[in-house]
Design a protein with these regions (language model features):
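Short hydrophobic/aromatic beta-strand immediately N-terminal to the Walker A/P-loop
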Residues: 53-55, 90
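Conserved nucleic-acid-binding Ia/Ib motif block in the N-terminal RecA-like helicase ATPase lobe
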Residues: 22-25, 32, 79-119
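The conserved Walker
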Residues: 56-60
């Protein structure tokens, strides 16, 4: 079993593999040309159906990583959420400030899906 802090090199043909169109659009608008190492690791684990725990520095892209990781589970084949959709995910943050930061990040990431985020 590899060490918990090991990083596997992953190569994808697309900048953000298996990312639904609304997210690709949001990422492009934010000038995300390629995933960070944390995002690559999360997307690879998601593609393999693995569970994971992620710990990385501030600014490493963790919020976008888990926002993308749950996207296909939440949306399925659709590109937008129904207007009357009830809550579908809960993300717990240890502080109010971090909860608000997560909300801001997911708000732009999910903008084109019709999703709402609250903190």
């Amino acid at each position: 079993m590899p060490a918990l802090n090991s990083v596997r090199k992953v190569t994808f043909k697309l900048p953000f593999p298996q990312t639904p169109a609304p997210f690709t659009r949001a990422l492009t608008e934010r000038k995300y040309d390629e995933p960070t190492p944390v995002q690559l690791a999360v997307l690879e684990a998601r593609a393999e159906g693995s569970d994971l725990v992620v710990s990385a520095q501030t600014g490493s892209g963790k919020t976008v990583a888990y926002g993308l990781a749950i996207a296909t589970t939440l949306l399925g084949e659709a590109e937008r959420f129904p207007q009357d959709a009830s809550p579908m995910a809960l993300i717990v943050a240890p502080t109010r400030e971090l909860a608000m930061q997560v909300e801001r990040e997911l708000e732009w990431l999910y903008h084109y899906t019709g999703a709402r985020s609250l903190s």
